[in-house]
Amino acid sequence: MDTGNIKDIKELLDSEAARINSPEFIADDPVQFPRRFERQQDIEIIALLSATIAWGNRKMICRNCEKLIRIFEGRPYDYVMDGAYETLPDGNIHRTFFVENLKHYLRGLRSIYSRFSTLEEMAVAEGVPADEMPAWRLVEAMNRRFAEANGGMCDSRCLPGNLRTTALKRINMALRWLVRDDGIVDMGVWKALRPSQLFIPMDVHVGNTSRNLGLLQRRSNDREAVIQLTDTLRAFRPDDPVIYDYALFGLGIGIGVANS
């Protein structure tokens, strides 16, 4: 992109980010669910699980996030630590995510919370804030602890295992909620990470929108594409590159490549 075009693109992204990053965005987005809670552990649990099932139709995602909160009886951390999930009957949570997958996830979280006061504390102990790729380092640590809590078994429905290639869209989205703190949509309860360290939550819609805008050349929506796109956005806002996740969402709707 030439200098003039870069300036135009930045102005477009800034304008769209300001429009979408507003209180009105919350009501139709999965971020509404962790925002209902005040205790950090509750926020972490609901942020992770809401992000985990955040694929497909947004109305269905939100409906099934409500289902999770009902299962937890409105007290996620207490529910996890009581081990109440072990008696859940088989059933579907969201699309290809079933109760057996939920149990795997909650066993892992229970193991973590039995050793650390918060998931953030575990992240610090695992060196996540010092890593150049914090989301991938976090998932590596969580996968290891989840496997320990599940007889050595991993579950790709819960967390990806192919960390060399995965875009980690859902964990990067959860980290956006947990780390960014502008007092509007994202909650900023994690202080060990800075917004400048975050990476864009990449999916097919973000990828297509970014290519249409000339922000991304790579054709695959993988880890390398996340790095390339985030580096481009970081040149616009070194302190907060993922603010442009809102812009790419809004512009994606406008050009017909994002979920409604």
Q: Which residues make up each language-model segment?
A:
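HhH-family (HhH-GPD) DNA N-glycosylase catalytic core used in base-excision repair
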Residues: 1-260
